[in-house]
Amino acid sequence: MFSIQQPLLVFSDLDGTLLDSHSYDWQPAAPWLSRLREANVPVILCSSKTSAEMLYLQKTLGLQGLPLIAENGAVIQLAEQWQDIDGFPRIISGISHGEISQVLNTLREKEHFKFTTFDDVDDATIAEWTGLSRSQAALTQLHEASVTLIWRDSDERMAQFTARLNELGLQFMQGARFWHVLDASAGKDQAANWIIATYQQLSGKRPTTLGLGDGPNDAPLLEVMDYAVIVKGLNREGVHLHDEDPTRVWRTQREGPEGWREGLDHFFSAR
């Protein structure tokens, strides 16, 4: 098995995992965050959120300066000490937010798909949808390489929409609350592998990895982890991995940050 004393990276989703889906509370996870920080174990946030949102949350959680994965892997925010790496401070995968928006506007105009993007509304509306403050809601609109939307059409039309996006080199991904469109080449798994390889190159040893997530869009991330915690979530589809060996994967009984704490307790408390 493994311990927090060895080279280790922890990758964590946010909403529904480290943060409560409704209140955004993270206090149940605070003791473990402190313990990992004291052991110099990087906790790498990985989410559909924008880098602007996540940098704010990093500071709140005491994780500032560490790398993070934003917009479902389309954006990698580099660690503060990685200034010599090409692309610092952020690496963008695939086409830009503006280019994706143009594609979506064309599809909506010509093929009459029904959806509302975050670009279609103001921060007050997003605050109503999410329960965030207006200042935090404004950060959700600062996309760099994806578009977030609410789907307002039928399941049949969604299948057609997804197929059209795939033809255009894009993917349609379900999050905890919203849907996301990003380049087909981007993903949480590719971003995580890049970060793991960078730590390995800098230290000379591949770190052991632990990932935590609660939704279907976390599955690619958890697949490439050495160990995985599937936090009990609200999504009816859940998370299904190809390798669910119980020595590698733990499914929690609790939701959100309490489940996050439960997962860390399972893998580390007895060690």
Swiss-Prot record:
Catalytic class of the enzyme: hydrolase
Active site positions: D13 (nucleophile)
Domain of life of the organism encoding this protein: Bacteria
GO cellular component: cytosol
InterPro entries noted in UniProt: HAD-like_sf, HAD-SF-IIB-MPGP, HAD-SF_hydro_IIB, HAD_sf, MPG_Pase
A GO molecular function held by the record: magnesium ion binding
HAMAP family according to UniProt: MPGP_rel
Protein name stated in the entry: Mannosyl-3-phosphoglycerate phosphatase
Taxonomic lineage: Bacteria, Pseudomonadati, Pseudomonadota, Gammaproteobacteria, Enterobacterales
